[in-house]
Amino acid sequence: MRTVLTGASGFVGSNIDKVLVDRHGDVVLSERVDMTDRDAVFAHVRSSQPDAVVHCAILNDWDLMHTDRRLAWKSYVEATRNYADAAAEIDVPFCLVSTDWVFDGTQGGATEDTPPNPINLYGFLKAASEIVALDRGGSVARVMGVNGTHWARPASPREQDPGFGYFVASLVDALETHQPFTVWEGDDINGVASPSLGAMCGEVIRQVIAGGHRGIFHCCGSATTTRRELAEATVDVFGLDRSLLRFGPAPPESFAGQTIPFDTSVSAVATAERLGTPLLSLGDLLASFRHERITGELAPLS
């Protein structure tokens, strides 16, 4: 397959790229284009002659999103419209990469059919983008609690944030150098989620576009976990020193001005049944990430 992929230099995008190229031998077309420029997007998609379009790029600047709402709308919703319409023009599958933050934090165990109810700007923009993608006959792949390797920048340090992404890498980086790590806990951050592995998300998305599937898909494992439970499982799988774990509130500056959904756990059973993709246990997910860190390669499919 030939796939136009936006956001390939980002964390999730680099995993999609890695899976498409290394596991499936696909060609990924990831030329940087101004995604808010409709003419430029159409020209790029037409000239690339892809078999599918995957839109993963975002405006990854929380402060700018809030200070320039017009730019935020253009960078999320209008950009999605541009790529979805460009894919429709040449009649190829379109997939939008979305998030569990389209839910409000009280909808634990949400399925692919659960109505979104975002409580912050990022979730709202993603939910609006989902409507655009689905209205144009595309698909939506929600990624959640994404951990794993940043293949475009594998040596870059990771920091814990109020969500679940990067959590495992930031913990392992600290404990492997014998530094204590404080696991954030509290009702004002994302305290419960369904973790995923970046490469696993890439595999789900590959199956979606290869099969020309439409609708909503969830990219995660089978487990619902708290931050504390994820930290303790990580210590066990990676063979780290549990005594270095600490537990406490997140620094206020880490989420200043943000409203964050507490419980974003979801079910991916329907996705697994529809696509035939595995639902990894938490232990298998962490073991796959450990394999990536040791070998620098994707773990075999379970």
Go through the PLM ranges and name each one:
Residues 1-20:
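N-terminal Rossmann NAD(P)H-binding glycine-rich loop of SDR-like oxidoreductase domains
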Residues 35-78, 86, 101:
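NAD(P)H-binding glycine-rich loop region in Rossmannoid oxidoreductase-like domains
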Residues 81-117:
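Conserved Rossmann-fold NAD(P)-dependent oxidoreductase catalytic core, especially the SDR/UDP-sugar
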Residues 117-144, 169:
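Active-site Tyr-X1-5-Lys
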Residues 136-199:
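NAD(P)-dependent short-chain dehydrogenase/reductase
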Residues 183-192, 217-224, 274:
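Glycine-rich Rossmann NAD(P)(H)-binding loop
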Residues 197-257, 290-302:
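Mid/C-terminal beta-alpha module of Rossmann-like enzyme folds, strongest
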Residues 243-244, 259-302:
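C-terminal amphipathic/interface module of NAD(P)-dependent oxidoreductases
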